């Protein structure tokens, strides 16, 4: 019996080794991995196992060359080759990398899925284990805050559009009794863009109401407040420090449209303004969660506001909305945004190119025409950030041998 148990453990280890190495040399990772791409140029694609075992996730599995070679010999993917002396490995020349064309990029986007609802303390291995029977996953990106805290959501790339669609279309998927929000990546971004557009429309409408209200003092505000009675839901409890407004949108996504959330991260209570009656949204959400409506796995007290408490809260929300609108106006609204993002270079070019009459724009300026280099197009725009290419399935930056990592230990991540 003990021998059977050992054999099962070894088989599981070998499967993990194959999966990890085949990820390193796979279609998704290899084109993005600068270090590994440099290594395969040195010796006809061969990479020494001595180098490979310095990759952190493989190192945690094994450093034994024989175990690695034995594992790869049992792989059914036929992606990797082992050298005759069993000291080097390479991606099989018969399996060339796909050409990274626009068509290929679109194909990757079409089989990328957004999944939200994981606890913030979940690890990459936890998520990989949960996804094991959901289809073949080529890459997992754990989405993080600016402070590197896991946000509880991921982007996963499936091996085919069919497997991605099958996963997205499967209803009622949960992670440890927590309902998950699952969308195609493109649908997720479309949803976020629609929310931004809706916010702009609401801001314009609010501005119009305020303008009309100045001619009829109190009438517009009174009608607006009366129309929102019964739409406020107060929540309180020992909330997670990472709780954010998006969590409430997720919780009530199919039960009621949220118009405003009076809440700041780190607070223990707040108020949600629904478009329709808050009681209906609360009952629907409770029913969908078997009567136990948790927020990031924390117990929460939910209360529909009435009477003076409701009027006071509505007045505060109205004032906050007006303040937000005023700030937006003070920045110039659309005019201010014309100088942000993709068009910011137009102002800068005034000082970089030739001045009037072919003269330099300023003293000491280089002669010649200042040329805009174009917007940078990223293949993987999940985080919408610039910086080193990430090794997504590790949830870290690309791995390099420990010797190189030691040269930059001032705040660098664990490799």
From Swiss-Prot:
GO biological process, one term: protein localization to cytoplasmic stress granule
One Gene Ontology MF term: sequence-specific mRNA binding
Residue numbers bearing the N6-acetyllysine modification: 116, 128, 327, 356
Modified-residue entries (Phosphothreonine), positions: 120, 377
Record field: compositional bias (Basic residues): 328-341
Localization per record: Nucleus
Domain HTH La-type RNA-binding intervals: 7-99
Family annotation (Gene3D superfamilies): 3.30.70.330, Winged helix-like DNA-binding domain superfamily/Winged helix DNA-binding domain
Principal location listed in the UniProt entry: nucleus
Free-text function comment from the UniProt entry: Binds to the 3' poly(U) terminus of nascent RNA polymerase III transcripts, protecting them from exonuclease digestion and facilitating their folding and maturation.
Stated name of the protein: Lupus La protein homolog
UniProt organism field: Rattus norvegicus
């Amino acid at each position: 019996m003990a021998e059977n148990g050992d054999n099962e453990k070894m088989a599981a280890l070998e499967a993990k080794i194959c999966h990890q190495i085949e990820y390193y040399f796979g279609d998704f990772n290899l084109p993005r991995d600068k270090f590994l791409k440099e290594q395969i140029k040195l010796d006809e694609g061969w990479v020494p196992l001595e180098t490979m075992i310095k990759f952190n996730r493989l190192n945690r599995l094994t450093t034994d060359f024989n175990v690695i070679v034995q594992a790869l010999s049992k792989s059914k993917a036929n992606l990797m080759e082992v050298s005759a002396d069993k000291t080097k490995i390479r991606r099989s020349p018969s399996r060339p990398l796909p050409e990274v064309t626009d068509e290929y990029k679109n194909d990757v986007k079409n089989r990328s899925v957004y999944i939200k609802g994981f606890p913030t303390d979940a690890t990459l291995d936890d998520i990989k284990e949960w996804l094991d029977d959901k289809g073949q996953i080529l890459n997992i990106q754990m989405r993080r805050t600016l402070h590197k805290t896991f946000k509880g959501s991921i982007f996963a790339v499936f091996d085919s559009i069919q497997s991605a669609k099958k996963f997205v279309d499967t209803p009622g998927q949960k992670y440890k009794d927590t309902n998950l929000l699952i969308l195609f990546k493109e649908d997720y971004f479309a949803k976020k863009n629609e929310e931004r557009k809706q916010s702009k429309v609401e801001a314009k409408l609010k501005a119009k109401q305020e303008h009309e209200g100045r001619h009829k003092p109190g009438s517009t505000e009174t009608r607006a407040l009366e129309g929102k009675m019964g739409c406020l839901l107060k929540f309180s409890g020992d909330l997670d420090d990472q709780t954010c407004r998006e969590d409430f949108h997720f919780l009530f996504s199919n039960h009621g449209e949220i118009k405003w959330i009076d809440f700041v991260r780190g607070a223990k209570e707040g108020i949600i303004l629904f478009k329709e009656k808050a009681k209906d949204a609360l009952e629907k959400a409770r029913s969908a969660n078997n009567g136990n409506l948790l927020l990031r796995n924390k117990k929460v007290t939910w209360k529909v506001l009435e009477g003076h408490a409701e009027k006071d809260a509505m007045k505060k929300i109205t004032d906050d909305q007006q303040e937000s609108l005023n700030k937006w106006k003070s920045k110039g609204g659309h005019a201010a945004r014309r100088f942000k993002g993709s068009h910011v270079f137009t102002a800068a070019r005034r000082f970089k190119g030739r001045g009037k009459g072919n003269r330099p724009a300023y003293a000491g300026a280089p002669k010649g025409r200042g040329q805009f280099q174009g917007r940078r197009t990223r293949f993987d725009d999940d985080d919408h950030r610039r910086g080193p290419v990430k090794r997504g399935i590790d949830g870290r930056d690309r791995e390099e041998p420990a010797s190189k990592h030691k040269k930059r230990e001032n705040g660098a991540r664990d490799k």
